[in-house]
Amino acid sequence: SGCESFLNPRDLTEDGLCPDHLKKPEEVKEENYFFKLSKYKDRIIEHIKKNPDFIQPEFRANEVLNQLEHIEDISVSRSKESVSWGIPVPGDDSQIIYVWIDALSNYITALGYDPETPSDMFKTYWPADVQVIGKDILKFHAIYWPAFLMALDIPLPKTILAHGWITIDQTKMSKSIGNVIAPKDVMETFELSHPDAFRYFMMVTAPTGRDGNYSDLDFKERVNADLANNIGNLLNRTLNMQVKYFDGEIKQEFITDSDNEIAKEALKTVQLVKNRFDKYEVAEAAQEIVNFSNTVNKYVNDTAPWSLAKEGKLEECAKVLYNVLESMRFIAALLAPYTPNISQDVYEQLNRSEKAVEVKLDELKWGEIPVGKITEKEKIKPVFLRLDSEIAGAAKKG
């Protein structure tokens, strides 16, 4: 298999191989139709420079600009003899349309594009806000695709987001090597009842646009640290203290306002996460959430609510616990795109009726855990058990 693209000698490795697939290209000589890509070179360069969000992450834009310096007109058909199947060129059955022409056009034809009578779907959803593609096919989406759209006088997508690859133990996945891992294999190996842990890891393992790596050890260490030790343990011990000292009940005098430092940190974290999401920085957004949970854990250790209760400072203890429970509500809402099942478990243990995944970040306000009994001893359970623990294996909880 290959990339089905034309390569100049300067595009090859020192050994004369395709840089993406490390295979020797096939030399073909035939008569084809061409698209005058060079005609749109300056327009594409201008568009990239005037619209810094067009190619994300930004360092990929520089790669595309360098490629544009040497851009040439491209063959957009193949002879029927060399390609046995495909869409015939209109008016010339001896030629088949080049795969990247019909593949790219699917983005708009699937929406019902028609130059004379475009569908309502096309008018509603095009131009796309963002097109997410792999870094190895960036040239086709950031050079060829804009040129085709310009030729048709169709608006360009607002952003092309190029993601990196996921390697396995620092090696590129390959069927020939036999190191391809399917998500269901991970779930079966670790006896996960839902995919949240794997989903979380895959979303946080690679900074925006960079490669990420999967290994069993990295997976276990990351999800145990973030989901079990940090977030899960924080909720569990706080709810247990709420039951132990206050019978699981929150009274009006326990509720804190948004002027306290933890509340300020919670609201600040919401804004940081939103800003990260706006820039498609998914892994970085998760780190903001983990940073906040670290802050809350430190707050618990510093204030020592168990000591406050022992000293008879019950109202002070209650306010500390309320701050932590409210923080957990914020953390669950922020984590919902990563761990929808775990976030919902947190919401249910906080006696919340709404769906965690439906919470709008703009509407997150401090002080919304209401007065009344929110839990009891029998209802408290770990939302995420450490992987490889005997309990995790037996309970098949993930």
Could you tell me what each predicted segment is?
Residues L138, M202-G209, S215-D218, M241-Q252, ...:
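Active-site-proximal binding-pocket segments
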Residues L17-K244, Q287-I289:
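Structured secondary-structure scaffolds
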Residues S1-C3, G164-I166, D218, K251-D259, ...:
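A glycine-rich phosphate-binding loop feature that marks nucleotide/adenosyl-phosphate handling sites
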Residues S94, Y98, P195, E221-G232, ...:
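Amphipathic, non-membrane alpha-helical segments in soluble helical-bundle scaffolds
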Residues I166-M173, A225, I255-K268, N351-L364:
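Short, mixed-charge aromatic SLiMs
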Residues T117, F246-F254, D345:
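Short, glycine/acidic-rich hinge or "gate" loops at secondary-structure transitions
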Residues S1-G2, N8-L12, C18-H21, N275, ...:
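Basic, alpha-helical terminal appendages of large translation-related enzymes
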